[in-house]
C-alpha cells in the first residue's frame, strides 16, 4: 500500500474570502461622466494622486482632506487602527454620495479613497478631494462628502490600544467636532 506524501501546510489553510484578501485590491470604481474616482485599498494613500484626479481647468478651488490615525482615544493610547469593508456595497454607497455631491455642488471632480487593513499612527485612512468653480462650494462639498462617507459607507474600524485592548466601532459615532452622537442623531 502506497503512503500519501505529506501535505503542504499552506494548501490546507483556508483561503480568505475575496473581499478580505489584500491581493485582490485596490478596488476602484470610476465615473468619467462626473470625473469621480473611488478606491478601497490596503496601500498607503497618496494625496497628490487625489488632486491629480480632481484638477480641472474649470475649477477655481480644490479641497483636500486627509483623515489620520491619532495616538489616543478618550485618554487611551492607541497603537493602530484596522479597517474592513464589504467592497461591492461600500463602492456603491461611495458612488451614490459622490454623484449627489457633483450634482448638488456643481463639482468638477471627486476623489475618495479609504484605506483598509492596518493603519499606523499618523498615517491616512481616508482622503477626500473635490474641485469646484469656487472655494465656498468646494469647502461645503468636501465636508458633506466626508460626513456622509462616515455615516453611510460599509466600512468598519477596530481601534487597537497599547494596553492590548481593542474595540470595533462604527465610523460615525462622533460629529465633526468629536462630540459623541446619540443613537438617534446618526450612525448606521
Swiss-Prot record:
Any Pfam family the entry gives: MoaE
Main localisation: cytoplasm
A GO MF term: molybdopterin synthase activity
Gene Ontology cellular-component terms listed: cytosol; molybdopterin synthase complex
UniProt entry keywords in alphabetical sequence: Cytoplasm, Molybdenum cofactor biosynthesis, Transferase
Subcellular location(s) of the protein: Cytoplasm
Segments for region (Disordered): 1-23
Catalytic activity, EC: 2.8.1.12
Residue sites binding substrate per the record: 134-135, 150, 157-159
Any single biological process term in GO: Mo-molybdopterin cofactor biosynthetic process
Catalytic activity entry: 2 [molybdopterin-synthase sulfur-carrier protein]-C-terminal-Gly-aminoethanethioate + cyclic pyranopterin phosphate + H2O = molybdopterin + 2 [molybdopterin-synthase sulfur-carrier protein]-C-terminal Gly-Gly + 2 H(+)
Pathway membership: Cofactor biosynthesis; molybdopterin biosynthesis
Biased composition (Low complexity): 1-14
Cited InterPro entries: MoaE_sf, MOCS2B_euk, Mopterin_biosynth_MoaE
Domain of life of the organism encoding this protein: Eukaryota
Family per record: Belongs to the MoaE family. MOCS2B subfamily.
Protein purpose: Catalytic subunit of the molybdopterin synthase complex, a complex that catalyzes the conversion of precursor Z into molybdopterin. Acts by mediating the incorporation of 2 sulfur atoms from thiocarboxylated MOCS2A into precursor Z to generate a dithiolene group.
Oligomeric form and interacting partners: Heterotetramer; composed of 2 small (MOCS2A) and 2 large (MOCS2B) subunits.
Protein name: Molybdopterin synthase catalytic subunit
Gene source species: Aspergillus fumigatus (strain ATCC MYA-4609 / CBS 101355 / FGSC A1100 / Af293) (Neosartorya fumigata)
Amino acid at each position: 500500500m502506497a503512503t500519501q506524501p505529506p501535505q503542504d501546510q499552506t494548501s490546507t489553510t483556508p483561503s480568505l474570502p475575496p473581499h478580505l484578501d489584500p491581493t485582490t485590491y485596490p478596488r476602484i470604481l470610476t465615473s468619467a461622466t462626473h470625473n469621480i474616482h473611488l478606491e478601497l485599498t490596503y496601500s498607503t494613500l497618496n494625496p497628490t494622486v487625489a488632486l491629480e484626479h480632481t484638477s480641472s481647468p474649470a475649477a477655481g478651488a480644490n479641497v483636500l482632506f486627509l483623515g489620520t490615525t491619532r495616538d489616543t482615544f478618550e485618554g487611551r493610547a492607541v497603537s493602530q487602527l484596522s479597517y474592513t469593508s464589504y467592497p461591492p456595497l461600500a463602492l456603491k454607497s461611495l458612488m451614490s454620495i459622490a454623484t449627489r455631491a457633483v450634482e448638488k455642488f456643481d463639482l468638477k471632480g471627486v476623489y475618495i479613497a479609504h484605506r483598509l487593513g492596518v493603519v499606523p499612527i499618523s498615517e491616512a485612512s481616508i482622503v477626500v478631494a473635490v474641485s469646484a468653480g469656487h472655494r465656498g462650494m468646494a469647502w461645503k462639498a468636501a465636508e458633506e462628502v466626508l460626513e456622509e462617507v462616515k455615516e453611510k459607507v460599509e466600512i468598519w474600524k477596530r481601534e487597537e490600544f497599547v494596553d492590548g485592548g481593542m474595540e470595533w466601532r462604527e465610523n460615525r459615532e462622533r460629529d465633526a467636532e468629536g462630540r459623541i452622537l446619540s443613537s438617534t442623531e446618526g450612525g448606521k
